[in-house]
C-alpha cells in the first residue's frame, strides 16, 4: 500500500507565508533529521453485528496525517457544533470541513514542508499505514463516502424559468469522518480502530445538476 505525499510541484517553490501557521514545523523537521520517526496504522471498518460475523472494511476510505494545529481542530469543532443548528448548516458542514483541511494543507505546503502532509487510501481489508512520520503531535483525519441515489424528477422548462428553481438533486454522498489527535514518541507505532460506532462526524455532500433542457 503506497503512501502519497500530497504536494503540487508548483508549491515547492512557493514563498513561505510568515505567521500563517499556529504550529512550529521546525520541530518536525528536527525530529526527522535526528531519525526520530513513527508509524501510524489502523483499520477503517463497519463493526460486526453478530459475534460470529466479520467486520466489513470500508472500501476507499482516505486517511490524512497533518501536524497538529489548534486552529484547525477548533474550526472543525465549530463546524460540527454548527451543523446541529439548522438543515442548511448540516448540509454544508462536510464540505466546509474539507475546505478547512485543504486550506491548512496549503499553508503547510507553502511554508516549505509538503512532506508533512501525508495521505493514503485503505487497502482491501480496510487497513492503512503511514510510515516514517517525524515524532510529534499529529492530527489523523479519515473520511469515507458512499453515494446514495435520491434522484428527483427533472424540472419542466416553464417551471424552471418561472420559479428560478435550484439545481436538481441527483443524490448525496453520506460522509463519515474521524478526527484523532495523537502524540507520538520516537521509534513507536500507533494503531487506530476507526469504525461506524466511533465516527466523529456524519454528514452529507449533495450532488446536484442544472437541467439543460425540458423535463420528460
Describe the function of each predicted region.
Residues 17-216:
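Long luminal/extracellular ectodomains of secretory-pathway precursor proteins
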Residues 4-14:
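Bacterial N-terminal signal peptides
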